[in-house]
């Protein structure tokens, strides 16, 4: 695995990455997950995104650097995880995934876990 790109900020550490990927996997099972940079952009534009997860080892990284700008406009937290392969596995697909979006659902069973991870991501951005 190549070293993460320095443009990938904020980068989650190993424990936070694992928590994020666990929530991504649960959200995928609950149909609360959108996979890919294009779908993540759509959720941001529609205002239904809780937070955005991006892969730091994406090559070239510029194909998803529009997302942090959009996140800051929409006031949505975002984070980079080290591996696109791990993000793809957590999303439940056999291919690498460079970006994912957890969507809003007030009746969700994993709402508390989503908010806990969201708070940790927000502290990274400060």
Curated annotation (Swiss-Prot):
Q: Which GO terms describe its molecular function?
A: RNA binding
Organism this protein belongs to: Kluyveromyces lactis (strain ATCC 8585 / CBS 2359 / DSM 70799 / NBRC 1267 / NRRL Y-1140 / WM37) (Yeast)
Q: How does it assemble?
A: Component of the U3 snoRNP particle. Binds to the C'/D and B/C motifs in U3 snoRNA. Component of the 25S U4/U6.U5 tri-snRNP particle, a subcomplex of the spliceosome. Binds to the 5' stem-loop of U4 snRNA.
Family matches, as PANTHER family: RIBOSOMAL PROTEIN L7AE FAMILY MEMBER
Family named by the database record = Belongs to the eukaryotic ribosomal protein eL8 family.
- GO cellular component, as recorded: nucleolus; spliceosomal complex
Keyword annotations for this protein, in alphabetical order, are: mRNA processing, mRNA splicing, Nucleus, Ribonucleoprotein, Ribosome biogenesis, RNA-binding, rRNA processing, Spliceosome
What does this chain do?
Common component of the spliceosome and rRNA processing machinery. In association with the spliceosomal U4/U6.U5 tri-snRNP particle, required for splicing of pre-mRNA. In association with box C/D snoRNPs, required for processing of pre-ribosomal RNA (rRNA) and site-specific 2'-O-methylation of substrate RNAs. Essential for the accumulation and stability of U4 snRNA, U6 snRNA, and box C/D snoRNAs.
Q: Which Gene3D superfamilies match?
A: 3.30.1330.30
Cross-referenced InterPro entries, in alphabetical order? eL8/uL1-like (IPR050257), H/ACA_rnp_Nhp2-like (IPR002415), Ribosomal_eL30-like_sf (IPR029064), Ribosomal_eL8-like_CS (IPR004037), Ribosomal_eL8/eL30/eS12/Gad45 (IPR004038), Ribosomal_eL8/Nhp2 (IPR018492)
One of its GO biological process terms is: mRNA processing
Its main localization is nucleus
Q: Where in the cell is it found?
A: Nucleus, Nucleolus
Annotated protein name in UniProt: 13 kDa ribonucleoprotein-associated protein
């Amino acid at each position: 695995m190549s070293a993460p790109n320095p443009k990938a900020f904020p980068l989650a550490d190993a424990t936070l990455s694992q928590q994020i990927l666990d929530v991504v996997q649960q959200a995928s099972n609950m149909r609360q997950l959108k996979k890919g940079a294009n779908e993540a952009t759509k959720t941001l534009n529609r205002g239904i995104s809780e937070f955005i997860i991006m892969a730091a080892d994406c090559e070239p990284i510029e194909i998803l650097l529009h997302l942090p700008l959009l996140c800051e406009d929409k006031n949505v937290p975002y984070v980079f995880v080290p591996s696109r392969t791990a993000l793809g596995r957590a999303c439940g697909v056999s291919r690498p995934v460079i970006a994912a979006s957890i969507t809003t659902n007030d009746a969700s069973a994993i709402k508390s876990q989503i908010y806990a991870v969201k708070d940790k991501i927000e502290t990274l951005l400060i």
